[in-house]
Amino acid sequence: MISIVKSKSFGLAAVMTLICSVAGIFLAKLPYVNLIGALVIALLLGISLQVLPVGVREEAAPGIGFISNKFLRLGIILLGFRLNLTKLADAGIKTILVAMLGVSGTIVLTYWLSKKFGAEDELAVLSACGCGICGAAAVMGVSPQIESRDEERKRENEVLAVAVVCVMGTVFTLLEIVIKPMLGLTDSQFGIVAGGSLHEIAHAIAAGSAFGEASLDSALIMKLSRVLLLAPVALIIGYWYQRRLVKESAQDHTQAPKKLPIPWFLGGFILTSILGTFLPFPPVVLDGLVQAAYVFLGMAMAALGISVNFSVIFKRGGTVFGAAAISSTCLMIFMIIMSKLFF
């Protein structure tokens, strides 16, 4: 690892992806563009770098691979500082329970529909987690738990899953803002709907802030309740995938993976959420750590954009987009009902 960090390839890759990541953070603060979110903007900027000469991209390739893997995990760990467990506890058990129902139901429904529509397993799982938990960060957090024999295909699936949650999240953000006056919800109830149904944290913030502080506060608490489920969901999916591989290997008389991959970075995610909650960090320090998380995640997303083959992706997109549209609609309806009944 030290040798690659010292290499020219890593330096070139770091400069390319850092520019994309920082630009994504600043562009995400602009009106309307904020609906997309910093991570997706970084991905799109990474895609734009595919116009660079082939020689430059080939020289950066080892560093790009390192950043897409290691920086992703570092970003997920630091993202834990965004979770304030005390605030989640204050919101009450009903908030966590509703989040659990929404997340689990959406993951199962999106996965089932994706398979029905002909999507491959890995793509169905990643899209389901992105729709159910927290968008691009969930896709990238769950992906390391999925064993794959074809790394290029896996990268294509990651980008396609991110594209799904970006498009669906943006569409449903606008839809929920438009229909809010027709729903008979208080501002706080609408925040619950936005935080419980929209895909990215950026989407929840954009919708919640449209109707004042009460709406925004509710949206953030509900959304972070879903983010809290990232670690357990990734563990469950890793275990489930491992069991499936063992079973398939027994049937095919091939060698199965010997052990479940240990998601140490998810342990770090939980640890940082505990540290951020119970240690007296100044707000400016916590904000800085969360910003650092998005810088590293943005670099990983840009690296993904630089290295992926999009001509293949566009041919396979329809199956998961249809599934995500249906499951996102069901999740929105579920959250409207829950907000009226319990909040």
UniProtKB/Swiss-Prot annotation:
The keyword Zinc-finger does not apply. GO terms for cellular component: plasma membrane. Pfam families: Cons_hypoth698. InterPro entries: UPF0324_pro. The keyword Transmembrane applies. It is a multi-pass membrane protein. This is UPF0324 membrane protein LJ_1117. The chain crosses the membrane at residues 10-27, 32-54, 64-86, 91-113, 123-145, 157-179, 219-241, 262-284, 288-310, 317-339. Its main location: membrane. Keywords: Cell membrane, Membrane, Transmembrane, Transmembrane helix. It is found in: Cell membrane. Belongs to the UPF0324 family. It comes from the Bacteria. It comes from Lactobacillus johnsonii (strain CNCM I-12250 / La1 / NCC 533).
